[in-house]
Protein backbone atom coordinates (compact mmCIF):
# COMPACT_ATOMS: atom_id res chain seq x y z
CA UNK A 1 0.00 0.00 0.00
CA UNK A 2 1.12 3.58 -0.62
CA UNK A 3 -0.32 4.88 2.62
CA UNK A 4 -0.04 8.50 3.72
CA UNK A 5 -2.19 8.92 6.80
CA UNK A 6 -1.86 12.60 7.47
CA UNK A 7 -1.36 13.79 11.01
CA UNK A 8 -3.21 16.75 12.50
CA UNK A 9 -0.71 19.26 11.05
CA UNK A 10 -1.36 18.08 7.48
CA UNK A 11 -4.97 19.34 7.45
CA UNK A 12 -6.34 15.97 6.32
CA UNK A 13 -9.98 16.98 6.23
CA UNK A 14 -9.35 20.18 4.31
CA UNK A 15 -7.36 18.12 1.81
CA UNK A 16 -10.21 15.61 1.64
CA UNK A 17 -12.64 18.45 1.02
CA UNK A 18 -10.42 19.72 -1.81
CA UNK A 19 -10.52 16.30 -3.45
CA UNK A 20 -14.30 16.24 -2.95
CA UNK A 21 -14.53 19.67 -4.58
CA UNK A 22 -12.55 18.29 -7.53
CA UNK A 23 -15.06 15.47 -7.98
CA UNK A 24 -17.91 17.96 -7.58
CA UNK A 25 -16.46 20.14 -10.33
CA UNK A 26 -15.81 17.35 -12.81
CA UNK A 27 -19.23 15.76 -12.23
CA UNK A 28 -20.88 19.16 -12.65
CA UNK A 29 -19.09 19.52 -15.98
CA UNK A 30 -20.06 15.98 -16.99
CA UNK A 31 -23.75 16.34 -16.11
CA UNK A 32 -24.24 19.95 -17.22
CA UNK A 33 -25.85 19.08 -20.61
CA UNK A 34 -28.60 17.16 -18.78
CA UNK A 35 -30.10 20.46 -17.62
CA UNK A 36 -29.18 22.34 -20.81
CA UNK A 37 -30.22 19.79 -23.41
CA UNK A 38 -33.25 21.73 -24.63
CA UNK A 39 -31.49 25.09 -25.28
CA UNK A 40 -28.42 23.36 -26.78
CA UNK A 41 -30.65 21.42 -29.18
CA UNK A 42 -32.44 24.65 -30.12
CA UNK A 43 -29.24 26.65 -30.68
CA UNK A 44 -27.27 24.03 -32.61
CA UNK A 45 -30.21 22.50 -34.53
CA UNK A 46 -29.76 18.88 -33.35
CA UNK A 47 -32.12 16.12 -32.29
CA UNK A 48 -32.51 15.32 -28.60
CA UNK A 49 -31.18 11.82 -29.21
CA UNK A 50 -28.05 13.08 -30.98
CA UNK A 51 -27.45 15.71 -28.33
CA UNK A 52 -27.48 12.87 -25.80
CA UNK A 53 -23.98 12.10 -27.10
CA UNK A 54 -22.85 15.10 -25.06
CA UNK A 55 -23.22 12.77 -22.07
CA UNK A 56 -22.17 9.47 -23.65
CA UNK A 57 -18.99 10.69 -25.41
CA UNK A 58 -17.09 11.97 -22.35
CA UNK A 59 -18.19 8.93 -20.38
CA UNK A 60 -16.88 6.58 -23.07
CA UNK A 61 -13.47 8.26 -23.18
CA UNK A 62 -13.35 8.35 -19.37
CA UNK A 63 -13.95 4.60 -19.34
CA UNK A 64 -11.07 4.03 -21.75
CA UNK A 65 -8.71 6.41 -19.97
CA UNK A 66 -9.21 5.55 -16.28
CA UNK A 67 -7.18 2.29 -16.24
CA UNK A 68 -4.52 3.85 -18.47
CA UNK A 69 -3.99 6.63 -15.93
CA UNK A 70 -2.89 4.32 -13.13
CA UNK A 71 -0.83 2.24 -15.57
CA UNK A 72 0.89 5.17 -17.25
CA UNK A 73 1.32 7.33 -14.16
CA UNK A 74 3.67 4.79 -12.58
CA UNK A 75 5.26 6.60 -9.60
CA UNK A 76 4.12 10.11 -10.52
CA UNK A 77 2.97 12.08 -7.50
CA UNK A 78 -0.85 11.91 -7.40
CA UNK A 79 -1.06 15.58 -6.42
CA UNK A 80 0.72 16.56 -9.64
CA UNK A 81 -1.68 14.42 -11.66
CA UNK A 82 -4.73 16.05 -10.09
CA UNK A 83 -3.32 19.50 -10.83
CA UNK A 84 -2.74 18.56 -14.47
CA UNK A 85 -6.23 17.17 -14.93
CA UNK A 86 -7.82 20.27 -13.40
CA UNK A 87 -5.91 22.43 -15.90
CA UNK A 88 -7.29 20.22 -18.67
CA UNK A 89 -10.78 20.57 -17.17
CA UNK A 90 -10.54 24.36 -17.40
CA UNK A 91 -9.54 24.12 -21.07
CA UNK A 92 -12.36 21.67 -21.91
CA UNK A 93 -15.05 23.94 -20.48
CA UNK A 94 -13.65 27.06 -22.13
CA UNK A 95 -13.77 25.22 -25.46
CA UNK A 96 -17.36 24.13 -24.78
CA UNK A 97 -18.38 27.71 -23.99
CA UNK A 98 -16.89 28.89 -27.28
CA UNK A 99 -18.32 26.06 -29.43
CA UNK A 100 -20.26 27.26 -32.47
CA UNK A 101 -21.26 23.81 -33.73
CA UNK A 102 -22.27 20.47 -32.28
CA UNK A 103 -19.05 18.92 -33.65
CA UNK A 104 -16.90 21.42 -31.73
CA UNK A 105 -18.96 20.84 -28.61
CA UNK A 106 -18.40 17.09 -29.06
CA UNK A 107 -14.63 17.75 -29.21
CA UNK A 108 -14.78 19.68 -25.94
CA UNK A 109 -16.72 16.85 -24.33
CA UNK A 110 -14.18 14.26 -25.49
CA UNK A 111 -11.45 16.35 -23.85
CA UNK A 112 -13.59 16.39 -20.72
CA UNK A 113 -13.68 12.58 -20.85
CA UNK A 114 -9.94 12.44 -20.25
CA UNK A 115 -10.39 14.70 -17.21
CA UNK A 116 -13.16 12.53 -15.79
CA UNK A 117 -11.19 9.31 -16.18
CA UNK A 118 -8.04 10.81 -14.71
CA UNK A 119 -9.55 12.61 -11.72
CA UNK A 120 -11.81 9.75 -10.67
CA UNK A 121 -9.16 7.06 -11.12
CA UNK A 122 -7.00 8.91 -8.60
CA UNK A 123 -9.59 10.43 -6.26
CA UNK A 124 -11.38 7.14 -5.58
CA UNK A 125 -8.35 5.70 -3.79
CA UNK A 126 -7.21 8.78 -1.84
CA UNK A 127 -9.50 8.52 1.18
CA UNK A 128 -7.37 5.93 2.97
CA UNK A 129 -4.22 7.96 2.24
CA UNK A 130 -5.48 11.28 3.57
CA UNK A 131 -7.19 10.29 6.84
CA UNK A 132 -6.66 7.69 9.59
CA UNK A 133 -8.18 4.22 9.00
CA UNK A 134 -11.10 4.84 11.36
CA UNK A 135 -12.20 7.85 9.28
CA UNK A 136 -11.98 6.31 5.80
CA UNK A 137 -15.73 5.69 5.57
CA UNK A 138 -16.56 9.33 6.24
CA UNK A 139 -13.81 10.51 3.89
CA UNK A 140 -15.28 8.32 1.14
CA UNK A 141 -18.67 9.94 1.71
CA UNK A 142 -17.08 13.40 1.42
CA UNK A 143 -15.21 12.55 -1.79
CA UNK A 144 -18.13 10.75 -3.42
CA UNK A 145 -20.51 13.32 -2.01
CA UNK A 146 -19.25 15.48 -4.87
CA UNK A 147 -21.53 13.45 -7.14
CA UNK A 148 -24.68 14.28 -5.18
CA UNK A 149 -23.56 17.83 -4.44
CA UNK A 150 -23.11 18.42 -8.17
CA UNK A 151 -26.76 17.51 -8.61
CA UNK A 152 -27.77 19.94 -5.86
CA UNK A 153 -25.71 22.97 -6.80
CA UNK A 154 -23.99 22.28 -10.10
CA UNK A 155 -26.64 21.07 -12.53
CA UNK A 156 -29.50 23.31 -11.25
CA UNK A 157 -27.15 26.32 -11.29
CA UNK A 158 -26.34 25.41 -14.88
CA UNK A 159 -30.06 25.37 -15.65
CA UNK A 160 -30.55 28.81 -14.06
CA UNK A 161 -27.57 30.29 -15.92
CA UNK A 162 -28.70 28.66 -19.13
CA UNK A 163 -32.19 30.12 -18.77
CA UNK A 164 -30.96 33.59 -17.78
CA UNK A 165 -27.75 34.09 -19.78
CA UNK A 166 -27.53 31.20 -22.24
CA UNK A 167 -25.98 27.74 -22.02
CA UNK A 168 -22.48 29.00 -22.90
CA UNK A 169 -22.29 30.94 -19.65
CA UNK A 170 -22.97 27.72 -17.75
CA UNK A 171 -19.85 26.10 -19.23
CA UNK A 172 -17.85 29.27 -18.57
CA UNK A 173 -18.95 29.19 -14.93
CA UNK A 174 -17.66 25.62 -14.58
CA UNK A 175 -14.30 26.72 -16.00
CA UNK A 176 -14.10 29.40 -13.29
CA UNK A 177 -15.07 26.86 -10.63
CA UNK A 178 -12.33 24.50 -11.85
CA UNK A 179 -9.79 27.33 -11.57
CA UNK A 180 -10.83 28.05 -7.97
CA UNK A 181 -10.68 24.34 -7.15
CA UNK A 182 -7.17 24.20 -8.58
CA UNK A 183 -6.06 27.05 -6.32
CA UNK A 184 -7.46 25.32 -3.24
CA UNK A 185 -5.85 22.03 -4.23
CA UNK A 186 -2.45 23.69 -4.58
CA UNK A 187 -2.81 25.21 -1.10
CA UNK A 188 -4.04 22.27 0.98
CA UNK A 189 -3.33 18.95 -0.74
CA UNK A 190 -0.06 17.37 0.44
CA UNK A 191 2.37 15.57 -1.80
CA UNK A 192 1.06 12.08 -2.61
CA UNK A 193 4.08 10.03 -3.68
CA UNK A 194 3.73 6.45 -4.89
CA UNK A 195 6.35 3.90 -3.87
CA UNK A 196 4.98 0.92 -5.78
CA UNK A 197 4.06 1.36 -9.43
CA UNK A 198 1.01 -0.46 -10.79
CA UNK A 199 1.68 -2.85 -13.67
CA UNK A 200 -0.47 -4.77 -16.13
CA UNK A 201 -0.05 -7.80 -13.87
CA UNK A 202 -1.81 -5.86 -11.11
CA UNK A 203 -4.90 -5.78 -13.33
CA UNK A 204 -4.74 -9.36 -14.60
CA UNK A 205 -4.43 -10.61 -11.02
CA UNK A 206 -8.01 -9.42 -10.43
CA UNK A 207 -9.50 -11.71 -13.10
CA UNK A 208 -10.12 -14.37 -10.46
CA UNK A 209 -11.60 -11.93 -7.94
CA UNK A 210 -15.26 -12.94 -8.17
CA UNK A 211 -16.50 -10.33 -5.72
CA UNK A 212 -14.81 -7.56 -7.70
CA UNK A 213 -16.22 -8.86 -10.99
CA UNK A 214 -19.71 -9.01 -9.51
CA UNK A 215 -19.31 -5.45 -8.26
CA UNK A 216 -18.31 -4.32 -11.75
CA UNK A 217 -21.37 -6.03 -13.26
CA UNK A 218 -23.65 -4.34 -10.72
CA UNK A 219 -21.96 -1.01 -11.44
CA UNK A 220 -22.69 -1.35 -15.14
CA UNK A 221 -26.33 -2.32 -14.69
CA UNK A 222 -27.20 0.29 -12.04
CA UNK A 223 -25.48 3.18 -13.78
CA UNK A 224 -26.57 2.29 -17.32
CA UNK A 225 -30.17 1.84 -16.21
CA UNK A 226 -30.09 5.19 -14.43
CA UNK A 227 -28.58 7.15 -17.32
CA UNK A 228 -30.86 5.64 -19.95
CA UNK A 229 -33.58 7.67 -18.25
CA UNK A 230 -31.73 10.52 -16.47
CA UNK A 231 -30.07 11.86 -19.62
CA UNK A 232 -33.56 12.91 -20.71
CA UNK A 233 -34.91 14.00 -17.33
CA UNK A 234 -35.68 17.55 -18.47
CA UNK A 235 -37.87 16.58 -21.45
CA UNK A 236 -39.34 13.83 -19.24
CA UNK A 237 -40.40 16.34 -16.59
CA UNK A 238 -41.72 18.84 -19.11
CA UNK A 239 -43.52 16.59 -21.60
CA UNK A 240 -44.67 13.71 -19.36
CA UNK A 241 -45.23 15.37 -15.98
CA UNK A 242 -46.32 18.69 -17.48
CA UNK A 243 -43.84 20.74 -15.44
CA UNK A 244 -43.05 24.23 -16.73
CA UNK A 245 -39.45 24.97 -17.70
CA UNK A 246 -39.01 27.51 -14.89
CA UNK A 247 -39.61 24.75 -12.31
CA UNK A 248 -37.09 22.28 -13.74
CA UNK A 249 -34.14 23.96 -12.00
CA UNK A 250 -35.74 23.96 -8.52
CA UNK A 251 -36.85 20.34 -8.98
CA UNK A 252 -33.36 19.24 -9.97
CA UNK A 253 -32.09 21.10 -6.92
CA UNK A 254 -34.51 19.10 -4.76
CA UNK A 255 -33.38 15.94 -6.56
CA UNK A 256 -29.80 16.76 -5.60
CA UNK A 257 -30.66 17.48 -1.96
CA UNK A 258 -32.33 14.07 -1.85
CA UNK A 259 -29.17 12.65 -3.43
CA UNK A 260 -26.91 14.12 -0.75
CA UNK A 261 -29.14 12.59 1.92
CA UNK A 262 -29.04 9.27 0.06
CA UNK A 263 -25.24 9.47 -0.17
CA UNK A 264 -24.68 9.77 3.58
CA UNK A 265 -27.49 7.37 4.52
CA UNK A 266 -26.13 4.74 2.15
CA UNK A 267 -22.56 5.37 3.30
CA UNK A 268 -23.50 4.49 6.87
CA UNK A 269 -25.80 1.62 5.90
CA UNK A 270 -23.30 0.09 3.48
CA UNK A 271 -20.72 -0.16 6.26
CA UNK A 272 -23.07 -2.57 8.07
CA UNK A 273 -25.17 -4.28 5.37
CA UNK A 274 -23.62 -3.60 1.97
CA UNK A 275 -25.58 -6.10 -0.13
CA UNK A 276 -28.93 -5.12 1.37
CA UNK A 277 -28.15 -1.43 0.88
CA UNK A 278 -27.42 -1.95 -2.81
CA UNK A 279 -30.59 -4.02 -3.21
CA UNK A 280 -32.71 -1.21 -1.75
CA UNK A 281 -30.95 1.28 -4.03
CA UNK A 282 -31.69 -0.87 -7.09
CA UNK A 283 -35.34 -1.21 -6.04
CA UNK A 284 -35.73 2.54 -5.49
CA UNK A 285 -34.18 3.38 -8.85
CA UNK A 286 -36.31 0.81 -10.68
CA UNK A 287 -39.53 2.11 -9.13
CA UNK A 288 -38.66 5.72 -9.91
CA UNK A 289 -37.72 5.31 -13.58
CA UNK A 290 -40.61 2.91 -14.23
CA UNK A 291 -43.35 4.84 -12.46
CA UNK A 292 -42.45 8.40 -13.45
CA UNK A 293 -43.30 7.93 -17.17
CA UNK A 294 -46.17 5.52 -16.43
CA UNK A 295 -47.90 7.26 -13.50
CA UNK A 296 -46.21 10.65 -13.18
CA UNK A 297 -48.56 12.52 -15.52
CA UNK A 298 -49.05 15.40 -13.10
CA UNK A 299 -46.50 17.82 -11.60
CA UNK A 300 -47.03 16.50 -8.04
CA UNK A 301 -46.65 12.80 -8.83
CA UNK A 302 -43.79 13.46 -11.25
CA UNK A 303 -41.96 15.46 -8.57
CA UNK A 304 -42.50 12.71 -5.97
CA UNK A 305 -40.98 10.06 -8.23
CA UNK A 306 -38.06 12.40 -8.99
CA UNK A 307 -37.29 12.75 -5.26
CA UNK A 308 -37.35 8.96 -4.82
CA UNK A 309 -34.98 8.77 -7.79
CA UNK A 310 -32.62 11.26 -6.14
CA UNK A 311 -32.49 9.45 -2.79
CA UNK A 312 -31.81 6.11 -4.47
CA UNK A 313 -29.17 7.30 -6.91
CA UNK A 314 -27.42 9.35 -4.23
CA UNK A 315 -26.28 6.12 -2.59
CA UNK A 316 -24.98 4.42 -5.74
CA UNK A 317 -21.41 5.77 -5.94
CA UNK A 318 -20.43 5.47 -2.29
CA UNK A 319 -21.98 1.99 -1.91
CA UNK A 320 -20.36 0.60 -5.04
CA UNK A 321 -16.97 2.06 -4.07
CA UNK A 322 -17.33 0.47 -0.62
CA UNK A 323 -17.92 -2.84 -2.44
CA UNK A 324 -14.71 -2.33 -4.46
CA UNK A 325 -12.62 -1.56 -1.38
CA UNK A 326 -13.87 -4.72 0.34
CA UNK A 327 -13.35 -6.79 -2.79
CA UNK A 328 -9.74 -5.70 -3.37
CA UNK A 329 -8.29 -4.14 -0.19
CA UNK A 330 -4.70 -4.57 -1.39
CA UNK A 331 -5.30 -3.23 -4.90
CA UNK A 332 -7.28 -0.06 -4.24
CA UNK A 333 -6.16 1.98 -7.27
CA UNK A 334 -6.65 -1.00 -9.58
CA UNK A 335 -10.16 -1.62 -8.25
CA UNK A 336 -10.94 2.10 -8.30
CA UNK A 337 -9.82 2.57 -11.91
CA UNK A 338 -11.78 -0.49 -13.06
CA UNK A 339 -14.81 0.79 -11.19
CA UNK A 340 -14.53 4.23 -12.79
CA UNK A 341 -14.03 2.63 -16.22
CA UNK A 342 -17.19 0.51 -15.88
CA UNK A 343 -19.09 3.40 -14.31
CA UNK A 344 -18.37 5.69 -17.24
CA UNK A 345 -18.81 2.96 -19.83
CA UNK A 346 -22.25 2.45 -18.32
CA UNK A 347 -22.99 6.19 -18.56
CA UNK A 348 -21.98 6.11 -22.21
CA UNK A 349 -23.94 2.96 -23.06
CA UNK A 350 -26.95 4.03 -21.02
CA UNK A 351 -27.25 7.53 -22.48
CA UNK A 352 -26.56 6.25 -26.01
CA UNK A 353 -29.16 3.49 -25.69
CA UNK A 354 -31.59 5.97 -24.17
CA UNK A 355 -31.08 8.34 -27.10
CA UNK A 356 -31.82 5.59 -29.60
CA UNK A 357 -34.94 4.50 -27.72
CA UNK A 358 -36.22 8.06 -27.24
CA UNK A 359 -35.76 8.88 -30.93
CA UNK A 360 -37.54 5.71 -32.06
CA UNK A 361 -40.01 4.81 -29.29
CA UNK A 362 -40.41 7.81 -27.02
CA UNK A 363 -39.77 8.69 -23.38
CA UNK A 364 -42.24 6.24 -21.83
CA UNK A 365 -40.79 3.17 -23.55
CA UNK A 366 -37.32 4.34 -22.58
CA UNK A 367 -38.40 4.53 -18.93
CA UNK A 368 -39.77 1.00 -19.02
CA UNK A 369 -36.59 -0.41 -20.56
CA UNK A 370 -34.44 1.52 -18.06
CA UNK A 371 -36.45 0.02 -15.21
CA UNK A 372 -35.94 -3.48 -16.58
CA UNK A 373 -32.16 -3.01 -16.54
CA UNK A 374 -32.33 -1.89 -12.91
CA UNK A 375 -34.58 -4.80 -11.96
CA UNK A 376 -31.95 -7.14 -13.43
CA UNK A 377 -29.39 -5.68 -11.01
CA UNK A 378 -31.85 -6.20 -8.16
CA UNK A 379 -32.44 -9.83 -9.20
CA UNK A 380 -28.69 -10.52 -9.21
CA UNK A 381 -28.32 -9.05 -5.72
CA UNK A 382 -31.25 -11.10 -4.41
CA UNK A 383 -29.94 -14.34 -5.91
CA UNK A 384 -26.38 -13.79 -4.68
CA UNK A 385 -25.99 -15.39 -1.27
CA UNK A 386 -24.07 -13.36 1.34
CA UNK A 387 -22.16 -16.50 2.33
CA UNK A 388 -20.90 -16.89 -1.23
CA UNK A 389 -19.65 -13.31 -1.25
CA UNK A 390 -17.85 -13.77 2.04
CA UNK A 391 -16.21 -16.96 0.79
CA UNK A 392 -15.20 -15.31 -2.47
CA UNK A 393 -13.70 -12.34 -0.66
CA UNK A 394 -11.55 -14.59 1.53
CA UNK A 395 -10.44 -16.71 -1.40
CA UNK A 396 -9.77 -13.92 -3.88
CA UNK A 397 -8.31 -11.09 -1.78
CA UNK A 398 -5.22 -11.26 0.42
CA UNK A 399 -5.69 -10.08 3.99
CA UNK A 400 -5.71 -6.29 4.27
Model-derived regions, located:
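Paired small-residue
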Residues: 91-92, 103-112, 300-308
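Helix-loop-helix hairpin linking two adjacent transmembrane segments in secondary transporters
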Residues: 104, 133-134, 138-187, 236
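Helix-to-loop junctions at the C-terminal end of transmembrane segments
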Residues: 65-78, 262-274, 358
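Cytoplasmic helix-loop-helix junction between adjacent transmembrane helices
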Residues: 108-146
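C-terminal transmembrane helical hairpin of 12-TM major facilitator-type secondary transporters
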Residues: 276-320
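Primarily marks hydrophobic transmembrane alpha-helices of the MFS/SLC 12-helix fold
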Residues: 79-82, 105, 278-279
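Conserved MFS/SLC helix-loop-helix module at the cytosolic interface between two early adjacent transmembrane helices
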Residues: 64-100
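Helix-breaking motifs and short loop linkers at transmembrane-helix boundaries and internal kinks
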Residues: 45, 77, 98-104, 295-297
